[in-house]
Amino acid sequence: MPQIGLPRLVEIIRECAGDPDERDLDGDILDVTYQDLGYDSIALLEISAKLEQDLGVSIPGEELKTPRHTLHLVNTETAGEVA
């Protein structure tokens, strides 16, 4: 499975949150916590489920801290499948 970048992650976040354009996710958000971006634990569970559904990567919602951390977890997991 190919690695994903921030644009695809933002797409997933927007799909799961149900607010496609209300939050500013176009700026420098890599190191901003999901809590500071306005996402609660339910949204993180939905993001986690979407990552598993779309990418086959199982990451518990409570492990999702920031977009950068999420990308690291996803891309490490997908790289491990190829190796």
Swiss-Prot record:
A Gene Ontology molecular function term of the record: transferase activity
GO biological process: one example: antibiotic biosynthetic process
InterPro entries in alphabetical order: ACP-like_sf, PP-bd_ACP, Ppantetheine_attach_site
Domain Carrier: 3-83
Keyword Protein transport set for record: no
Transmembrane segments: none
Functional pathway: Antibiotic biosynthesis; tetracenomycin C biosynthesis
Modification comment: 4'-phosphopantetheine is transferred from CoA to a specific serine of apo-ACP.
Keyword terms: Antibiotic biosynthesis, Phosphopantetheine, Phosphoprotein, Transferase
Protein's job: Involved in the biosynthesis of tetracenomycin C (TCM C). Part of a type II polyketide synthase (PKS) that catalyzes the synthesis of tetracenomycin F2 (TCM F2), a precursor of TCM C, from malonyl-CoA. TcmM is an acyl carrier protein that serves as an acceptor of malonate from malonyl-CoA and acts as the tether for the substrates and intermediates of polyketide assembly.
Protein name: Tetracenomycin polyketide synthase acyl carrier protein
Organism: Streptomyces glaucescens
Taxonomy of the source species: Bacteria, Bacillati, Actinomycetota, Actinomycetes, Kitasatosporales
